[in-house]
Amino acid sequence: MHQNDTVGLPHKIKWITLCGLLMAINTIFSSFSVPVPGGHIYLNDIIIVIAALSLDPLGAFLVGGVGAFLGDFFFYPLPMFVSLATHGIRSVVMSLIVGRYGRDNSPVVLGATVLGALIAIAGYTLGKAYVYSTWEYAMLKLPFEILQAFIGSATVSYTHLTL
């Protein structure tokens, strides 16, 4: 191992540790839900938004996409690929926006969380229509998808903007 290979090693170790911790929390939060007609509202959106606003795009994808995928894999496997794609895209887009325009810029953070919520709503609505082979079921769940996306985005945006 050359000396240049160890430059930035503490940063890499912190990054891997933080991503692993947030991915585990995301997976655990996937097991907690609030029952609603036709399904559940999951609390892991809060961790996904935190990761997207705090990490680089790769870390955001690992925490948001892969963490949600693992949560579904362990607790409710049918939509796990929908979660991987939807939360993965959502996390990367949000991370790219705040990474480019500033994590401390309130309008940017708010805009990124709103766009992320719209991606989650559209992704899950289309994904559920495909997975369950019925557009009606996806429409039945739409108000709850909106509520879940709003809870995650609003909670994190509020705390992020007031700190």
Q: Where do the protein language model's features map onto the residues?
A:
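Loop-helix junctions at membrane interfaces
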Residues: 1-161
